[in-house]
Amino acid sequence: MSSFDYLKTAIKQQGCTLQQVADASGMTKGYLSQLLNAKIKSPSAQKLEALHRFLGLEFPRRQKNIGVVFGKFYPLHTGHIYLIQRACSQVDELHIIMGYDDTRDRGLFEDSAMSQQPTVSDRLRWLLQTFKYQKNIRIHAFNEEGMEPYPHGWDVWSNGIKAFMAEKGIQPSWIYTSEEADAPQYLEHLGIETVLVDPERTFMNISGAQIRENPFRYWEYIPTEVKPFFVRTVAILGGESSGKSTLVNKLANIFNTTSAWEYGRDYVFSHLGGDEMALQYSDYDKIALGHAQYIDFAVKYANKVAFIDTDFVTTQAFCKKYEGREHPFVQALIDEYRFDLVILLENNTPWVADGLRSLGSSVDRKAFQNLLVEMLKENNIEFVHVKEADYDGRFLRCVELVKEMMGEQG
């Protein structure tokens, strides 16, 4: 017998033809015939519900299996991802509830080796981006402000989380965690069974505390969507023919990472026919925007550190030099893009004419160098002045500066 024989009986009792039933239920007659004879392995729930509704029958709904994962995700790491992937393959719907507390989170940052503090939006974005193709995963943010940390805050926290889940309509069948000590607490305070995933950390031996303490040491455990947050940026500045581009390339090679080339040179070739004589004030915002995109790309794919050929202060300095005024859009990017290490190269290497340079005299080079220093100070940008005149000495000095910035983490 077919599991849908009761539908055949209902159709006969109502005296309807298959075509009439199919039309009313939003399906073809052929699909309905195969459905009634159990020829379709995974019938559409929507079509089945429409068919039951037309025949006046109650649609037999299967109880969903709901899972929930709690965490700070500060930061998200591959151990979290393993837990979540295991959980979401065992349930129909998985809810990830990210807890945040401004005071606690600030303390975690201050006790860490992280160069910047992740915001709540940063942490949500990591989760949303990482699991965006898995439609049975839902992401939530839960404010834990004022709740004592474990193990003292279970009563207050559990009351808060129960109210939160009730508001969101979340009725978990199971809680998934890797923390063995939390399982009895979840059962006692929430009345929900816990499924432990890799509690011994045999597959993913990592914790958020380890990454906060030394991100670069545990780089392999930081997910693709999270790595750009931890990337350190090094901007190499200097006047024309100061060796910036060559040095950036050499540094990226030696640190096995990415670099952002000077977009202004590409812009001159692609928009001005390779000659700066047509450059005007309205070009500087486009140059700055293009350079920002180069930087973002380099940071996204970097291996711990990204090297930047020329910063926005330099772009602004050229605008001021040639146009007699600063550009507000370029200034906005100066304010937005703050690099971890800014190296200003002394303009004391041989000047090389390449068709895109016009400040070749010693007087012009010195004046532009002074302008760069002045504007860096005006924008409260700390920098290291590298004065070595020979290329090898300059290279070695910059390598040491980068290693110093990376610290023991490098």
Curated annotation (Swiss-Prot):
Keyword RNA-binding in record: no
Binding of NAD(+) 2, residues: 259-261, 294-297
Pathway participation: Cofactor biosynthesis; NAD(+) biosynthesis [regulation]; Cofactor biosynthesis; NAD(+) biosynthesis; NAD(+) from nicotinamide D-ribonucleotide: step 1/1
Mutagenesis / variant outcome for changing residue 173 to N: No NMN adenylyltransferase activity. Binds DNA independently of NAD
Localization of this protein: Cell membrane; Cytoplasm
Substrates-to-products reaction catalysed: beta-nicotinamide D-ribonucleotide + ATP + H(+) = diphosphate + NAD(+); beta-nicotinamide D-riboside + ATP = beta-nicotinamide D-ribonucleotide + ADP + H(+)
UniProt EC number: 2.7.7.1, 2.7.1.22
Reported effect, residue 21 to M: Loss of DNA binding activity
Region (Ribosylnicotinamide kinase): 230-410
SUPFAM superfamilies: lambda repressor-like DNA-binding domains, Nucleotidylyl transferase, P-loop containing nucleoside triphosphate hydrolases
Membrane topology: Peripheral membrane protein
Record keywords, A-Z: ATP-binding, Cell membrane, Cytoplasm, DNA-binding, Kinase, Membrane, Multifunctional enzyme, NAD, Nucleotide-binding, Pyridine nucleotide biosynthesis, Repressor, Transcription, Transcription regulation, Transferase
GO cellular component: cytoplasm; plasma membrane
The keyword Ribosomal protein is annotated on this UniProt entry: no
Enzyme superclass (EC): transferase
Binding-site positions, NAD(+) 1: 70-73, 77, 104, 144-157, 177-179, 204-206
Reported impact of residue 43 to L: Loss of DNA binding activity
One GO MF term: ATP binding
Record domain HTH cro/C1-type: where: 7-62
CDD domains per record: HTH_XRE, NK, NMNAT_NadR
Residue segments, region Nicotinamide mononucleotide adenylyltransferase: 63-229
A GO biological process held by the record: NAD biosynthetic process
Complex and partners: Homotetramer.
Family: In the central section; belongs to the bacterial NMN adenylyltransferase family. In the C-terminal section; belongs to the bacterial RNK family.
Descriptive protein name: Trifunctional NAD biosynthesis/regulator protein NadR
Gene designation per UniProt: nadR
